Amino acid sequence: VLPLVDFLRRRGRQAAGALAEQLGISRATLMRAVRAAGDELVVRGAARRTQYAARRALRGQAAPLPVYRVDAEGTPQQIAWLHLTAPDGSALEMLQPLGWPLDEAARDGWFDGLPYPLQDLRPQGFLGRAFARHHAATLQVSEDPAAWSDDDTLHALSLLGEDTPGDLIVGETACRRWLQRVRAARAGEAEAPLREAELAQAYPALADAAMAAGLPGSSAGGEFPKFTAWRNGADGRPQAVLVKFSGSDDSPGTRRWSDLLVCEHLAGGVLAALGLPAAVSRIVQAGGRTFLEVERFDRHGALGRSGLVSWGAINGECFGLAGRSWAEAGRALAARGWLAAQEAQALARLWQFGRLLANTDMHDGNLSFRLGPGGGAPLAIAPVYDMLPMLYAPARGVELPPREYRPELPLPQDAAAWQAAAPVALDFWQRAAADERISAGFRGVCAENTRRLAALLG
């Protein structure tokens, strides 16, 4: 038993034939060793696809972690067991269909790291750093979540990950925390959502609290500080929102960040013309700040949740197309049957729109997918977010170097998508040039960009 387990700890998962050959034993001897090893091994696959791996402990705990899915009413249901394998992989033992598509290597549940549907649960960005800083001592992890290993991430998620993006929860402790929220909401004990009349006072206070958490300089890193909140929705139900905000001073850099928040709101308003869903947003100006309030599309009412996975997570696990365009992502997904052809075409239009919008930050994490409708491709484009002219973001958070808008004509293979996107981008620039929530100086930039794009259209 020991040679088998030690070998698998060093070498990672192995198929039966290769394992017997490398150990110099017969299949029958191997099967006896596997049975004797018992729970020290993780076994997945059937017949010739069977593979074996040594079980790995998480902070001294060798038991597998339950994975739960939260439904539209807020009720969690276990869908899988997550087994950790040596030296640094994992295996999903499905109790219900996962829903998210898997490539051939992952069909039996094997992953080289965390399963990709769990990758976006890891803390990241402004809110993720705030979470890490607040809980680092308790969790015994770095204050920088970018430095966390997969095991650090799983440890944090299993204890405190009850309210991450999407609809998945890992670990019994985190699930119990979610159930405490459910109980409080159903008993009428949860904090009441903000009323419309309260926003002008509440949002500046929440922004001050977010900045006081000790995370200054996020704009210097090219991102907006933000907070989450609940407010009364138009239908009377509680609505979860993500709120980005500008600084409160009147410096040129702060005014530019404010302008860009308004631009993001305006961009979302024209995307329907491209056949694309966009996150529902609005601008609130109060307390000397500009707030972009975005309705969370993975939350429904007080407790409901739905699944969400970024292209970055899917790409890293299944495609390896880092640094490629979203148009190429759409083609790759459609070629595998994971995305409908018309959705892939919509992604090509979105990519061209973003380029004509001067969005220089269309990375893999800024594109996400939902589960597709039953009977069709497994993926569907999630509402678009973070679409704004980042070319004009202040350098180092404060400086405003001159930036030149230079829209380009498309290559022949991109012409159809470009021709669909260009009039919509022109509409955006026209709206931005006329919107008085944007500073006069940047409205002038938008007006000049309108002229340049109109000239290119002919």
Describe every region a protein language model picked out:
Residues 2-458:
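Phosphate/dinucleotide-binding and metal-coordinating scaffold of catalytic cores
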